[in-house]
């Protein structure tokens, strides 16, 4: 009841709800492809790699989106370059590049005049989101979802069978980096909602939950977006009522939903599997 009253009275709570739900939906869309491609670590890497861009943006007094997006894309390109030009495997390249970028970000933070806003970027504070940030998040979400819809078939084929995709004449490498660009945009849009530390959880957990419930990509995307939005709403509710960290509350709700699916999913759930073993 207090939450509903707050929504009616406070503009900051309305902006927080809209921003959180938007992030939950678009994270579910991109997260589904990240899960299918086995690129969860890449999502973690890009979410950490944007930190120096955020720090530089604050030091120069410009919108953090510009710096964060630039460094996120640079990290994706750097990981691909190291992987292709050496014997280093992809997971090792990811570890090297994202650690270097994150370390650079920490050093740059120490030079920043104020660490308050940067703290919010690290851990999220959606209750302090501004109107400009809310609209930026909405625009990014619309752009990303529209591009995914346009390139849906290409992403579908290249995610399940890259060799077949190349046989069909698709540029698999271009699709990979294009998806990394979309991942970077989603990561940047989620910074003030759940923060750099927890953004990977909102990308992966709702999508992983949906993966347990269906084998169809379109249905998986719909379920992941729904779980992301529900996690955002419930997490924001507990954050507002009990004065909890908003990002952490959303991630915990998403994790609880995942474990419910992990136990009770009709075909993939742990209890269903045990029951099937007993019957056999």
Curated annotation (Swiss-Prot):
Main location: membrane
GO aspect biological process, one term: monoatomic ion transport
Keywords, alphabetical: Cell membrane, Ion transport, Membrane, Transmembrane, Transmembrane helix, Transport
Pfam families: ABC-3 (PF00950)
Residues spanning the membrane: 16-36, 41-61, 62-82, 92-112, 137-157, 168-188, 193-213, 221-241, 244-264
Superkingdom: Bacteria
Cross-referenced Gene3D superfamilies: ABC transporter involved in vitamin B12 uptake, BtuC
Location(s), subcellular: Cell membrane
Topology of the protein relative to the lipid bilayer: Multi-pass membrane protein
Keyword hit for Repressor: no
Family indicated by similarity: Belongs to the ABC-3 integral membrane protein family.
The protein's role, per its UniProt record: This protein is probably a component of a manganese permease, a binding protein-dependent, ATP-driven transport system.
Protein name as annotated: Manganese transport system membrane protein MntC
Organism the protein comes from: Listeria innocua serovar 6a (strain ATCC BAA-680 / CLIP 11262)
Organism classification: Bacteria, Bacillati, Bacillota, Bacilli, Bacillales
Primary gene name: mntC
């Amino acid at each position: 009841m207090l939450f509903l009253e707050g929504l009616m009275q406070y503009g900051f709570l309305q902006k927080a709800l809209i921003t959180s739900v938007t992030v939950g939906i678009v994270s579910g869309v991109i997260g589904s492809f990240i899960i299918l491609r086995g690129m969860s670590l890449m999502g973690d890497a890009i979410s950490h790699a944007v930190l120096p861009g955020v720090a530089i943006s604050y030091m120069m007094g410009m919108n953090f989106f510009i710096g964060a997006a630039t460094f996120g894309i640079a990290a994706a390109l750097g990981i691909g370059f190291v992987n292709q030009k050496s014997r280093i495997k992809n997971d090792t390249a990811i570890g090297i590049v994202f650690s270097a970028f994150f370390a650079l970000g920490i050093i740059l933070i120490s030079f920043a005049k104020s660490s308050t806003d940067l703290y919010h970027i690290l851990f999220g504070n959606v209750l302090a989101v501004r109107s400009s940030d809310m609209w930026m998040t909405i625009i990014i979400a619309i752009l990303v979802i529209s591009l995914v819809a346009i390139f849906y078939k290409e992403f579908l084929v290249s995610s399940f069978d890259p060799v077949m995709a190349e046989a069909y004449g698709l540029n698999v490498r271009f699709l990979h980096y294009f998806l990394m660009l979309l991942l970077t945009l989603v990561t940047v849009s989620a910074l003030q909602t759940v923060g750099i530390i927890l953004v990977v959880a909102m990308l992966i957990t709702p999508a992983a939950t949906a993966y347990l419930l269906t084998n169809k990509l379109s249905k998986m995307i719909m379920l992941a977006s729904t779980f992301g939005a529900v996690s955002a709403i419930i997490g924001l509710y507990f954050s507002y009522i009990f004065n909890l960290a908003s990002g952490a509350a959303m991630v915990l709700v998403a994790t609880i939903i995942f474990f419910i699916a992990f136990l009770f999913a009709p075909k993939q759930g742990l209890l269903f599997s045990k029951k099937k073993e007993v019957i056999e």
